[in-house]
Regions:
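Structured, active/binding-site neighborhoods that engage oxygen-rich ligands
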Residues: 1-252
């Protein structure tokens, strides 16, 4: 449902088909999750080192999953450094930070660390933190109204436009500032987890990343139906499924 031009802008599409497969969003989300699990209680330097290691290791193992050009270069550097990106890659992979955090301060701090290893532009960090904040609020019982208010107040995102207002002129963009507010809006308008995914895709943008951001918040708010979990798991490699199961066991 994602093309360079003329993206699909409706909600009535098959959620899965025989060609469905995971993308870079899945790979990097699992890499971040493993890094954070492996470094619980350690200092920032250790966490960042683990993030770089896991992201490079998994990224190199799954090379053709839709990474950005600059990120591909970073994956293969011997001494990688952040490259001042404000792309939406920082927000698509951040969910583990919100899931592990014991309070909002920790959620924001972990989100910042996960972004900074590549996306150290202020907008790249903000996108990751806004996503983590919305997810943390969702999983700790906040209402949609409270989530909207917090995100608008703390991050300055304009969440006033509806999806119907966003959709006509929206297109494939990869910046945090043009992806994260739209993804959060899709969650705010959703009726359940599946509807959240469909709404995000229907905007017609960077579909997998929109759905990754919207879906992470929706999972925390609604939970995920078991049939959808099963459909996703069977499309993972044994290695990635093992990482997912380990994450679910240790984060529970």
């Amino acid at each position: 449902y994602e093309f360079d031009f003329n993206n699909y802008k409706a909600k009535d599409f098959p959620l899965f088909c025989r060609h469905s497969e995971f993308t870079d969003d899945t790979v990097m989300t699992l890499a971040v999750a493993k890094a954070l699990l492996d470094t619980c209680g350690q200092d920032d330097a250790a966490i960042k080192a683990a993030l770089v290691h896991q992201m490079q290791q998994l990224g190199r193992a799954y090379p053709d999953k839709g990474y950005g050009t600059r990120f591909i270069g970073w994956l293969h550097e011997d001494d990688p450094h952040p490259y001042n990106s404000y792309g939406n890659g920082s927000a698509m992979r951040v969910s583990a930070a919100a899931e592990l955090a014991e309070d909002m301060e920790q959620a924001l701090h972990l989100a910042k660390l996960t972004a900074e290893v590549t996306h150290n532009h202020p907008e790249g960090i903000k996108g990751a933190q806004a996503t983590a904040a919305a997810m943390f609020l969702a999983r700790t019982g906040s209402s949609k109204a409270d989530i909207r208010t917090y995100v608008e107040r703390e991050f300055g995102y304009d969440l006033s436009r509806s999806c119907d207002e966003i959709r006509p002129d929206y297109h494939h963009v990869e910046s945090c500032q043009e992806t994260v507010p739209q993804a959060i809006t899709a969650f705010l308008e959703s009726a359940d987890f599946e509807d959240a995914l469909r709404t995000a895709v229907s905007l017609g943008g960077d579909s997998d990343t929109l759905a990754a951001i919207t879906g992470s918040i929706a999972e925390a708010f609604y939970g995920v139906p078991e049939n959808l979990k099963a459909e996703c798991r069977r499309r993972l490699t044994p290695e990635l499924e093992a990482l997912l199961l380990a994450w679910e066991a240790r984060a529970a």
